[in-house]
Each structure stands twice: as structure tokens, then as C-alpha cells.
């Protein structure tokens, strides 16, 4: 092949003409000190709060403290190779994580990188972890239910799509169990779930993943794992990363449910980072902005209107509202709900489910305290039939707890009080429910109907659970049409009432338990 010198010179001239020698304006700084994952940098003049900083070895950090002559940053990930004198660069970007359908069924870390050994995640979409929550005009009121499948919650403290409902209690009271049951019950409803595990043992997270897989719920769930062995910075950003993944679905007119398990450990991680950054400590040694830490996270859980979704998707999705429902978990110490972080989160959320150690140890599981648990906005979202039938249950339980305490001292009780006590005993038994056994709306309605209409009055309190099991088996085998009808509409009228009464009369006449 003959090379023509003129062709070569022409090619070189063309390349020189098209070469762009624009200088890249990137501020560089120097690592002054490094300890406990906190880096002090000198020379980064125009760095922004929350900006990503690039270190050698493809490692990134987050600028948190902007001081007069230095910048305090936390390193995200391993920092053993970083040393004093190393160069650090501004990136001009804030931290973003991968989002999208590709993450469903996967376990990722706080940066959205796969940690489940199933290979890289195939998504090109990213979203910043910090976002401003939708404003008042962009929101819509909460009026659609999130069914957890737990009688005690759906009847007494209903949760609506776009609500923030706190699950609070001491350690080992079944907080995670309630959250996992809620995820399992979303199977087939189209609600996408995100489970954010902060500061937990890797074995506990693996157990949750296994349980979700066994019940076919992993395929609609993203698990964000920031284990106890990871740095405080990774634990601190995990809930924000999970929230960004949930917002992807909300902003596209879908419904998502996010569980933060738990925000106490996130507050501990943030306290650790703040103290290492030499920020002044306040109450319980937390920094001054620990309320803002949780409020800016939980305000992002909302129900957005159809105009917002249409605008966000550039008209691709029309007439659909989106929602992100949050179930934050807070762990209390010896039932003290008046500590700093619990009171903060109670004031931010739209209600709380209070789990009690004494009830849990007495075998009442889920161990929900009916008197202290409340849902401030869920009532408007509750299914009609459950709202109608469940109204008396909460009252019966609250009265029963009061009377039970009083009756220990009184020997002769009048007939009315004795009846209330007997009914309360049976309703308490009825509210018991095993883990991984969520109930449909119709099944729940039958249980509540049986309690309200006196079908349990002649059943021994110890046999109530057996009665319910036998009743549900009978309904599932011979009354499938009625169950389907109730599940489809959720209405409560004379026709439905007559059908339920006839079904229960038939069951009591022909079956034993």
C-alpha cells in the first residue's frame, strides 16, 4: 500500500484544526489530615456544600464542613490508600445514585452498587440523593389505602398512600416483622417497595432477603444495605439513597413504599460524623440539625397530583397520581418515647404504631398498643368495609386495657363491665396474627364482623385463634365469590352484610374448631 505524503499532511492539518485545547477549570486541593474517614482539605476555594470530591484511586468524598481556611469532608468507602499530601479535586456534582426498574430484586449499598453477587446493575439513569420535597400545590390528599395485611394495623391505624407512619418500640418487639409483612402484602398490587437497612448485622439483612425471596416479594423490592461494618458516612446517606430510588417510581405516576430500618442508627451515624467534624454538640450530643436530618428525608414521602406527574414525564404519563409512602422505624430505650430522636420523628410523621415489650412477651403479636398508636390521615384512605367494621375494635381494646387494670382490684363487677371485659379478651385474641400470614380485605372484614356481631361471644377466649383459622379455611373453600366481591369493591351494604351473616351462620352450624 503506497502512502501519499500530501494526504498525510492534510490529515495532520485537519486534526490540528479540530483540536480543542480548552482548559478545564477544576479546583484542586491538598489532603492536610485524614482520620476516622474524615479528611481535612486545603486549597479548595470554590467547593459547594454536599459536593462530591474526587480522591486518588477512584474514591469519592462528600464536602460537609466549609471553613475559612479548610474543608471537612467524609470519604465514601475505603480510605486506607489516601494519605497526607494527596491531591483532591472538585467535581462540580452532588452525589447521585442509580435509579430505575433494573434495581428491583437487587441488594445495593448506599451508593447504589450491587452487593448481592448477581453482577452489575444495568441502568443509565441516576438521581441526586438530596432533593427538595414537592410543594403544597404539587401534592394531593391521601385517600388510597396501603394494605399491610395485618388486622391490627388496617383496622385501627390505617395507612394511606403518601403517608408517613412511624413504627416505634424497644428492641425485639417485632418492628422489622411488621415492615416485612407490609412488603410481602404488596405482592400483586403494583406497589414497589424499598427496604433501607441502616447499621444492622449483615446476617439480619440476609435473613430479610431470604424471607422476601421465599414469599415471592423480592421481585418488587429494592434492598439498600448499609451494614454495621460500613463507615458512619455510608450509614448516614443510605436513607437518602433509598428515597431517591423510591422517588423514581413516585414521579412517574406509580406507587412506592419505603421502609427505613432504622432512623435511630442513622442519627447515631450522623452524630458520629458531626463530632468527628468538630461540630458543636447539643442535646444528647447530637448536632443542632438532627431534626432537619429526618424532616428533609420524610417530607419527600408524599402523594403528588396528576399535573406534577405529567409535567415531570413531559406528557408521557397522563391522569395518574404518584405516591411514596414511608414507614420509618425508631428504636426506643426502655420504652422512653420522650427522648430526643423519638420526639422529633413523632412530630414529623402522620401517626405512629407503638409496639410494647410487655404485650410482645404476653404473646400478643403484633404487639400494638391500641391506646398510644394513631394514624392522623389514614382514616380518609381506609377501605369502606374495614372502616365500618373496625370502628368498634379500637374502642373495645382501649376500654378493655383500662378495665382490665381496674378489675384486678375490684372483686364484684357489674354485668356490663364483665361483658366488656369478656369482649375485650376475645378481640385481643382476634388481633393476634402470625408472621408472614397477611390477610386480604375480605378475610379481615369477616374476622371483624364476627367480633362485632357477637359470633365470638360463646367461643372460649383461648379458642378464638382456632375459630378464626377454621372460619377462613371454610370461606376460602366455599365462599370464594363473596370474598372476591368484597375484595374488588371494598363496599359495605345490606347485600354484603346479609351474605356475611349467612356465611357465618352456616359455618357455626356445620363446623367445629
Curated annotation (Swiss-Prot):
Annotated site location: Required for activity: 373
Keyword list, A-Z: ATP synthesis, ATP-binding, Cell inner membrane, Cell membrane, CF(1), Hydrogen ion transport, Ion transport, Membrane, Nucleotide-binding, Translocase, Transport
Any Pfam family: ATP-synt_ab
EC number of this enzyme: 7.1.2.2
UniProt subcellular location: Cell inner membrane
Membrane topology: Peripheral membrane protein
Molecular function (Gene Ontology), one example: ATP binding
SUPFAM superfamilies the record matches: C-terminal domain of alpha and beta subunits of F1 ATP synthase, N-terminal domain of alpha and beta subunits of F1 ATP synthase, P-loop containing nucleoside triphosphate hydrolases
Catalytic activity entry: ATP + H2O + 4 H(+)(in) = ADP + phosphate + 5 H(+)(out)
A Gene Ontology cellular-component term: proton-transporting ATP synthase complex
Amino-acid positions noted as binding ATP in the UniProt annotation, renumbered to this chain: 169-176
Source taxon at top rank: Bacteria
Main subcellular location: membrane
Subunit structure: F-type ATPases have 2 components, CF(1) - the catalytic core - and CF(0) - the membrane proton channel. CF(1) has five subunits: alpha(3), beta(3), gamma(1), delta(1), epsilon(1). CF(0) has three main subunits: a(1), b(2) and c(9-12). The alpha and beta chains form an alternating ring which encloses part of the gamma chain. CF(1) is attached to CF(0) by a central stalk formed by the gamma and epsilon chains, while a peripheral stalk is formed by the delta and b chains.
HAMAP family per record: ATP_synth_alpha_bact
Family, per entry: Belongs to the ATPase alpha/beta chains family.
Purpose: Produces ATP from ADP in the presence of a proton gradient across the membrane. The alpha chain is a regulatory subunit.
Name of protein: ATP synthase subunit alpha
Lineage of origin: Bacteria, Pseudomonadati, Pseudomonadota, Gammaproteobacteria, Chromatiales
Gene: atpA
